[in-house]
Amino acid sequence: MSTDDEFWKYNNDMIVRCLAGVSRNDRPLFLKAAYNGPAATEEISSYDPANLVFGILGGSAGTTRDCLELLKQAEKYGARVALFGRKIYQSECSISMITAMRRVLEEDISSIEGVKAFHDDLSKLGIKPKRVLKDDLELTEEILQVNL
């Protein structure tokens, strides 16, 4: 068992144990946590889907591909909410970033296609991207690379 494998199992176990000690009336409706990969997300999102919505945290800004791939993988494995504050407000254009995120989910395009569309949108708005397209297409988050 790898360290990462041990961590997500421990983390999910602690979340469930904490929730077990809370009465149904006081239990949260929404749970947010870091994305720890497919198995971790599937397990925690299926804990009590009728009463608890699972969402992921965005973490650091990273590349646009990191953002869109995280969103794609998290949704695929059960997350239903994404709290991506920094990934949105630190992007070149918040509206264009949200548009790219919606395209990836609603139009079922790949994170690569989403990054290209995001750069096209920035170009149309006359906004210079922080990274050239080649660099923004890089997937820098290890947890996301493993699950492609």
Q: Regions from the language model: what does each represent?
A:
Residues 57, 62-64, 68-70, 119-120, ...:
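Mixed-charge, polar/low-complexity N-terminal
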Residues 56-62, 77-94:
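Glycine-rich phosphate-binding active-site loops on the catalytic face of alpha/beta enzymes
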Residues 11-12, 63, 93, 111:
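Intrinsic-disorder/low-complexity, polar/charged segments
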Residues 75-77, 89-147:
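C-terminal helical cap(s) of enzyme catalytic domains, especially alpha/beta-barrels
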Residues 1-54, 65-80:
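Alpha/beta enzyme core
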